[in-house]
């Protein structure tokens, strides 16, 4: 008889840890951290440990993941993710999401962007279940531990498939920045259609990105870098920004060093290929 994995064995420490974290998530996920009993008692929440959130490195974007998504952006209740920005009188949000990290992984980029852009709501979209849970728990802990300063209230994560449902979440021209950091390279040619940058998807990104907005890309795979640059340069609504612009942009510096994948590449002394593109004005129809 095959033994159960440790994560499913009721007698294991890992199982107990995951059950405890799941209960904490249910309790804290949709409440204002400064109103929780933990903060009132002055307690700190330990940051989650990745080893308890085992997940495959990649997920098939074409599979049916039974994801929840709104019919339209107007049907999305953002107050569950950003309760600090909900108007108590009318129940409406005081801000909209303007920065999106597509395939946010373990959330390192968002966490570094949060204090750098305190006036912007930042959303990470991640398709993998356990990775999303990890980022949720990480944000819960960070919000709790910096409650006196209302820290990290402007970031959150959403389990979603950006290749299928991005326009369901964002209005036309809503975003000012989109990040694609170390995406799945899909090396095999028959898998290239699953890459996050394609001609079709770029038209959707152009729709939700405002004119003058920026698409940020970074990867350690030269072939993928050349693929993304080629497709973005061929698209009529994007234009590459200069190397000088990249060197002086705050987001590029954060993007190079904040993500877990970026740190791994740094440890291995690998290359990081960066390319940034601005959203051009939509041509007038005569």
UniProtKB/Swiss-Prot annotation:
<feature type="active site">
    <location>
        <position position="184"/>
    </location>
</feature>
<dbReference type="GO" id="GO:0043527">
    <property type="term" value="C:tRNA methyltransferase complex"/>
</dbReference>
<keyword id="KW-0808">Transferase</keyword>
<dbReference type="InterPro" id="IPR029063">
    <property type="entry name" value="SAM-dependent_MTases_sf"/>
</dbReference>
<feature type="binding site">
    <location>
        <position position="103"/>
    </location>
    <ligand>
        <name>S-adenosyl-L-methionine</name>
    </ligand>
</feature>
<keyword id="KW-0597">Phosphoprotein</keyword>
<comment type="function">
    <text>Methyltransferase that catalyzes the formation of N(7)-methylguanine at position 46 (m7G46) in tRNA, a modification required to maintain stability of tRNAs; its absence resulting in tRNA decay. Both the D-stem and T-stem structures of tRNAs are required for efficient methyltransferase activity.</text>
</comment>
<feature type="binding site">
    <location>
        <begin position="259"/>
        <end position="261"/>
    </location>
    <ligand>
        <name>S-adenosyl-L-methionine</name>
    </ligand>
</feature>
<feature type="binding site">
    <location>
        <begin position="161"/>
        <end position="162"/>
    </location>
    <ligand>
        <name>S-adenosyl-L-methionine</name>
    </ligand>
</feature>
<comment type="pathway">
    <text>tRNA modification; N(7)-methylguanine-tRNA biosynthesis.</text>
</comment>
<comment type="similarity">
    <text>Belongs to the class I-like SAM-binding methyltransferase superfamily. TrmB family.</text>
</comment>
<comment type="subunit">
    <text>Forms a complex with TRM82.</text>
</comment>
<keyword id="KW-0949">S-adenosyl-L-methionine</keyword>
<keyword id="KW-0694">RNA-binding</keyword>
<dbReference type="InterPro" id="IPR003358">
    <property type="entry name" value="tRNA_(Gua-N-7)_MeTrfase_Trmb"/>
</dbReference>
<dbReference type="GO" id="GO:0005634">
    <property type="term" value="C:nucleus"/>
</dbReference>
<keyword id="KW-0539">Nucleus</keyword>
<dbReference type="InterPro" id="IPR025763">
    <property type="entry name" value="Trm8_euk"/>
</dbReference>
<feature type="modified residue" description="Phosphoserine">
    <location>
        <position position="7"/>
    </location>
</feature>
<protein>
    <recommendedName>
        <fullName>tRNA (guanine-N(7)-)-methyltransferase</fullName>
        <ecNumber>2.1.1.33</ecNumber>
    </recommendedName>
</protein>
<dbReference type="GO" id="GO:0000049">
    <property type="term" value="F:tRNA binding"/>
</dbReference>
<dbReference type="Pfam" id="PF02390">
    <property type="entry name" value="Methyltransf_4"/>
</dbReference>
<keyword id="KW-0819">tRNA processing</keyword>
<feature type="binding site">
    <location>
        <position position="181"/>
    </location>
    <ligand>
        <name>S-adenosyl-L-methionine</name>
    </ligand>
</feature>
<keyword id="KW-0489">Methyltransferase</keyword>
<feature type="binding site">
    <location>
        <begin position="126"/>
        <end position="127"/>
    </location>
    <ligand>
        <name>S-adenosyl-L-methionine</name>
    </ligand>
</feature>
<keyword id="KW-0820">tRNA-binding</keyword>
<dbReference type="GO" id="GO:0008176">
    <property type="term" value="F:tRNA (guanine(46)-N7)-methyltransferase activity"/>
</dbReference>
<feature type="modified residue" description="Phosphoserine">
    <location>
        <position position="59"/>
    </location>
</feature>
């Amino acid at each position: 008889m095959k033994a159960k994995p440790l994560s499913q064995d009721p007698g294991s420490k890992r199982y107990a840890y995951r059950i405890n974290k799941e209960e904490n998530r249910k309790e804290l996920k949709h409440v204002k951290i400064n109103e929780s009993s933990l903060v009132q008692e002055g307690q700190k929440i330990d940051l989650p440990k990745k080893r308890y959130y085992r997940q495959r490195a990649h997920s098939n974007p074409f599979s049916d993941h039974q994801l929840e998504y709104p019919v339209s952006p107007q049907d999305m209740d953002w107050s569950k993710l950003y309760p600090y920005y909900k108007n108590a009188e009318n129940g409406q949000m005081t801000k909209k999401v303007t920065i999106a990290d597509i395939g946010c992984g373990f959330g390192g980029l968002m966490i570094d962007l949060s204090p750098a852009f305190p006036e912007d709501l930042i959303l990470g979209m991640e398709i993998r279940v356990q990775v999303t849970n990890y980022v949720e728990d990480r944000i819960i802990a960070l919000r709790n531990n910096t409650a006196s300063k209302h820290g990290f209230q402007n970031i959150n994560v959403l389990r979603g498939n950006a290749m299928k449902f991005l326009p369901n979440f964002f209005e036309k021209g809503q975003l000012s920045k989109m990040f694609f950091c170390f995406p799945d390279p899909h090396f095999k040619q028959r898998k290239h259609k699953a890459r996050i940058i394609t001609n079709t998807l770029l038209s959707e990104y152009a729709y939700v990105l405002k004119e003058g907005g920026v698409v940020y890309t970074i990867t350690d795979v030269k072939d993928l870098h050349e693929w993304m640059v080629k497709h973005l340069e061929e698209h009529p609504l994007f234009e590459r920004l200069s190397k000088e612009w990249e060197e002086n942009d705050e987001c590029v510096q954060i993007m190079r060093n904040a993500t877990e994948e970026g740190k791994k590449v740094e440890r291995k002394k690998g290359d990081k290929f960066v390319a940034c593109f601005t959203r051009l004005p939509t041509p007038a129809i005569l």
